[in-house]
Amino acid sequence: MASPVPGRKITTPFKTKGRMWKFGYHTGVDYKCPIGTDICAAYDGKVLEVGSVSWGPSYGTAIVVDHGNGFRAIYAHLSKVLVKKGQRIKTGQHIGEAGNTGNSSGPHLHFEVRVAPFRYAPQCFVDPIVLIAMKAS
């Protein structure tokens, strides 16, 4: 996987502890970026959902992508979606723009990766930075 916002600072890493999250920790990574920042596909895949998605309203305007090999990702809190449901996307493709929608404390991208069965459950969350680091090495 590649970073969905290359060069942007991570403000809330995976598993940061906090009572505001259901499991007591953050289930993805947050990248600080102004509204309108280009969001890119972290890997090739197929767009499963756009807009208000089934993963929950707290994600705001979002894109859910099946990246294959048992991985799905959500790109959340977007101001703009540039892809459609069912569309095939490529690594690095501009798919949306950062925003401040849903349960958000300011403009950023929330990037979360899950493995099958893709539920909102502790055993389904994966640290995206580990996957990005694997690609880089």
Tell me the role of every PLM-derived stretch.
Residues 37, 69-72, 122:
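Short acidic/polar mixed-charge low-complexity motifs
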Residues 29-32, 61-68, 110-112:
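Short, acidic/hydrophobic/Gly-rich beta-strand patch recurrent on exposed beta strands
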Residues 43-44, 71-80:
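Short, solvent-exposed beta-edge and connector elements
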Residues 1-61, 91, 100, 104:
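Surface-exposed, glycine-biased beta-strand/turn segments
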Residues 20, 64-74:
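Short, basic/aromatic beta-hairpin or loop at an interaction surface
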Residues 74-78, 106-114:
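Histidine-centered catalytic micro-motifs
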Residues 14, 51, 79-82, 117:
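A generic structural motif
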Residues 1-2, 32, 81-93, 112-137:
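Acidic, glycine-rich catalytic/binding loops that coordinate metals and/or anionic ligands
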